Swiss-Prot record:
Name of the protein in question: UPF0251 protein Dole_1957
Pfam families xref list: DUF134 (PF02001)
InterPro entries: RNA_pol_sigma_r3/r4-like, UPF0251, WH-like_DNA-bd_sf
Similarity remark: Belongs to the UPF0251 family.
Amino acid sequence: MPRPTKTRTVVSEPDVCYFKPRGVPLRMLREVGLTVDELEALMLADLQGLPHEEAGRHMNISRATFGRVVRKARKTVADALVNGMAIRIEGGNYLRTGPDGAVLFCGKCRQEWPVVSSGGTPHECPMCKKEEDKKAEK
């Protein structure tokens, strides 16, 4: 049985969560999925040019894990570009850090709730009751 995926830290939600080739109706397109944490990895590595070790620290994961995440993200984007597919950005196991500290985020229904430093933070989504894997820390 594989180990559970470690919660990754991202700075913000993407403003745009869908891309498709111009001039092709959506109903005629195949679609690939890119998770929010994979998008964050692309931003850190390719847009900001951070070394994998530093980018991994930003996301609260190891350098090796960051390398696997960014490699999968690049493969997904390349597949979509080369084969003319749409890209949907959603989901993933991540913790979004906000201006006032950490918040938990449900990948299923997109609900957010704050992390309480006293340890009283609920570990399930208040909306859909999806159980969270890890306790987030500030």
